[in-house]
Design a protein with these regions (language model features):
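Single conserved hydrophobic/aromatic residue that forms the stacking wall/gate
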Residues: 1-11
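Short Gly/Pro-enriched turn/cap motifs at secondary-structure boundaries
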Residues: 3, 65-69, 119-123
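Extended, compositionally biased flexible segments
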Residues: 12-64
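Residue "hotspots" at secondary-structure boundaries inside conserved domains
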Residues: 14, 20, 67-69, 169, ...
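Residue-level recognition of short, solvent-exposed, well-ordered loop/turn junctions
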Residues: 16, 23, 55, 70-72, ...
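Catalytic-pocket segment enriched in acidic/His residues
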Residues: 31, 37-39, 107-215
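Short, structured patches in soluble enzyme cores that scaffold and shape functional sites
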Residues: 48, 73-75, 79-81, 99-104, ...
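N-terminal accessory regions of nucleic-acid-interacting proteins
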Residues: 84-98
Length: 215
């Protein structure tokens, strides 16, 4: 089904299981600085388990109460066509659209390991939705996260070190991307811990808000 939201064409995001969920790290300079990490010279990415996906309205479940677990607001790319070795200039033709997402992270585990797949792949750690916007420029969008009504993250996708088209191109040189695959483009500064009962809202300019609560 399609919807008209402020004149922008959108599609409902079903409960889908893509072949891949790809997360990109340290893609905003301010977040890299707050993490104490050097700026990447090329996109830093890893795979998240597709079973970590939940929709708008779903509940985030923290597996270890004693661990610090953080919210991370992100713009998500939804792939529309099979891609292999596409150039940045051609990348837009292979993108179905964009939606709001979170890359929830068990920071305690992340800080104890050199790989990030485990700390970000727990069930419910990738909220996505509620709709995919199919006609929107991804390069200059305000991105915000509100925790219980308080603004915690506030940036713009123009601050991405590697923009959406560059990411699609780079990742496609390393692996084939298939329709429905999701790329999380990175989070800006302001990440912080979540607690049971929290209401988290990701607002990205031109996209429907993504709202989830913490169980």
């Amino acid at each position: 089904r399609s919807y008209s939201v402020t004149g922008v064409q959108t599609c409902a995001l079903p409960i889908l299981v893509p072949t891949k969920v790809i997360a990109v790290g340290l893609n905003y300079a301010d977040h890299a600085r707050e993490s104490g990490k050097p700026l990447p010279k090329e996109p830093l990415f890893w795979l998240k388990a597709p079973t970590s996906l939940i929709p708008d309205g779903g509940k985030i479940e923290v597996p270890f109460a004693q661990h610090r677990t953080d919210y991370e607001a992100e713009l998500a790319i939804v792939i529309g066509r099979r891609i292999r070795n596409v150039t940045p200039a051609a990348a837009a033709r292979y993108i179905f659209g964009y939606t709001a997402a979170q890359d929830v992270s068990d920071r305690t585990i992340q800080n104890s390991e050199t790989q990030w797949a485990r700390c970000k792949s727990f069930d419910t750690f990738t909220p996505v939705g509620p709709y995919v916007e199919t006609k929107i420029d991804p390069h200059d969008l305000t991105i915000q996260l509100f925790q219980n009504g308080q603004l915690r993250q506030n940036s713009n996708t123009s601050q991405l070190i590697f923009n959406a088209y560059h990411l699609v191109s780079f990742i496609s040189t390393n692996m084939t991307l298939l329709p429905g695959d999701i790329i999380l483009t990175g989070t800006p500064s302001g990440v912080g811990p979540i607690e049971s009962g929290d209401r988290l809202e990701v607002r990205i300019q031109g996209l429907a808000p993504l709202i989830n609560t913490v169980k």
